[in-house]
Amino acid sequence: MIRFIFKHKKMHKPKELVFGQTIIQLNQVNGADKRKLIWLLIIKRSRQAFPYFQREDAVIYLDNAATTLKPQVLIDRTAEFYASAGSVHRSQYDAAQTVQYEQARTQVKEWVHAEDKHAVIWTSGTTHAINLVANGLMPQLNAEDEILISQADHHANFVTWHETAKKCGAKIQVLPILDNWLIDENALISALSEKTKLVALNFVSNVTGTEQPIKRLIQLIRKHSNALVLVDAAQAISHIKIDLQDLDADFLAFSAHKIYGPNGLGVLTGKLTALSQLQPLFFGGKMVDRVSNDRITFAELPYRLEAGTPNIAGVIGFNAVLDWLQKWDFTAAEQYAISLAESVKVRLKSYENCRLFNSPQASTVVCFVFDGIDCSDLSTLLSEQNIALRVGEHCAQPYLARLGERTTLRLSFAPYNTQEDVEAFFTALDKALDLLQ
């Protein structure tokens, strides 16, 4: 039995670890040993928080870049909401739900250091958020304007801006990525001009886990143009403590399900001055101020961009998740997950026909192929041994083309993964390779 002793209820790190009858004072432990003990705490707290691990049919889940598992706090709060009556912003009897709903905006504001809680707009996910920006800016764009995207982008960015450009006549420029998978900064500088109206940037790749130097890229954009900047933070939100005001991005989009929240909920946030430029994508209830036979005026932000009945259960559940996440040592949890992924990369290098597509930084993502072996065949055999990973194009065909591959395999780790998961993966991998080679 492992028991964790907290000296104060508000403390996030334990002062003591108790193994059976043995008490270990953490302030008396140094270096690697202390780190291992903290990681034991992370594993235990992580796995206890997720009911998935109590299932008899639970597989080895190594697909966290696709979506994270759901903690009990989310399930409990969502069930509690559905057991009660009411919507939000509608009448007096739903006042408690409305308070929690709006508290979630404040939580998101504080989590990403947004400018104002009114700059937090609920969407169905990152894709919806990006489309909200694209559609909202379209009336301002014309054939003289240019939009910059990159080979590093997810289709949610890449396709959306291509289609937007078609509709308004604007020109698309696709920035190349270098052999280290970072955006070519010289190409960015060359592409920027007074015609550049928007630059869409991918913060962290869902393919290789590569983190772009977003702050430096935005500084270059500010220096060489007056363009608006949109950051796709879908993969960054669960790994990086984002400070939106420090980044100086105009728009930032992410999905709740990437950070232990519910499916079907996302966030668009950014500068109020930038968000105020957006024309609504949808029209209807809640997004209006006054309506008469011949005149309609829209509500202020954020409501003017949130037409219709929102995902109330999702928002309130996400509020509980963010409150729960405040109790984590975010940096230690991330370092632990990275350590698992990096150990896998080291071991995969020992396989003669394995090729890795590593990011220049340590990350929780492992992207690889085996020469002469079909990725789908290998994935199928791993799946049959209860290993859940991702195979395919990862909604990033231009990125895969840059890698020179049609498909790749991807593992992605979270703090609830264990060394036992790693061993199970390699046991399954060796069996699969014996059948395929």
Curated annotation (Swiss-Prot):
<keyword id="KW-0663">Pyridoxal phosphate</keyword>
<dbReference type="InterPro" id="IPR015421">
    <property type="entry name" value="PyrdxlP-dep_Trfase_major"/>
</dbReference>
<dbReference type="InterPro" id="IPR015424">
    <property type="entry name" value="PyrdxlP-dep_Trfase"/>
</dbReference>
<dbReference type="InterPro" id="IPR010970">
    <property type="entry name" value="Cys_dSase_SufS"/>
</dbReference>
<dbReference type="InterPro" id="IPR016454">
    <property type="entry name" value="Cysteine_dSase"/>
</dbReference>
<comment type="function">
    <text>Catalyzes the removal of elemental sulfur and selenium atoms from L-cysteine, L-cystine, L-selenocysteine, and L-selenocystine to produce L-alanine.</text>
</comment>
<feature type="modified residue" description="N6-(pyridoxal phosphate)lysine">
    <location>
        <position position="258"/>
    </location>
</feature>
<comment type="similarity">
    <text>Belongs to the class-V pyridoxal-phosphate-dependent aminotransferase family. Csd subfamily.</text>
</comment>
<dbReference type="GO" id="GO:0031071">
    <property type="term" value="F:cysteine desulfurase activity"/>
</dbReference>
<dbReference type="InterPro" id="IPR015422">
    <property type="entry name" value="PyrdxlP-dep_Trfase_small"/>
</dbReference>
<dbReference type="GO" id="GO:0006534">
    <property type="term" value="P:cysteine metabolic process"/>
</dbReference>
<dbReference type="GO" id="GO:0030170">
    <property type="term" value="F:pyridoxal phosphate binding"/>
</dbReference>
<dbReference type="Pfam" id="PF00266">
    <property type="entry name" value="Aminotran_5"/>
</dbReference>
<keyword id="KW-0808">Transferase</keyword>
<protein>
    <recommendedName>
        <fullName>Probable cysteine desulfurase</fullName>
        <ecNumber>2.8.1.7</ecNumber>
    </recommendedName>
</protein>
<dbReference type="InterPro" id="IPR000192">
    <property type="entry name" value="Aminotrans_V_dom"/>
</dbReference>
